[in-house]
């Protein structure tokens, strides 16, 4: 399975308008496309950064959808004030403990490794890091997206409420240090978001 992320910086005061556009215009459009298996949206109301992710059953379906989403991407650029940064990924891991409701928070960890090391990284993540993450307070789900050509990774860890994410902060930071060392991965950035749209229908992979 594959995913396309669209990252954009918005004026924090107009984020709700952007969310409404994605919910009411973009989501119905992409969900009607062949091979689409859902959409999610993360928003940082302080910085204005938003990430819209669409998931696809195959890489071919993702690429064939490109023509159809150009108009909606241009419309989003009008609302947000700039064109999004678009990246394509393989969804390597999807694991859910339970569904999320209103108020869920997601921490995204971007990193990189040697491209040829990706299979070892994913094996270590599944066998050692992920079981420890399940013990974190409020842990709801995690997904790991990778670009095998560049070695880039993006791990999204979702908690059911801001309070439980806060409770898990120290242990989560410890797991990042331990996990990145064990996986041979360099962490590039860590950021936190509200999970404002959660409609990914990606099947469990573990």
Task: Show which residues each predicted segment covers.
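Short S/T/G/P-rich N-terminal loop/turn motif that feeds into the first structured element of a domain
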Residues: 1-51, 57-206
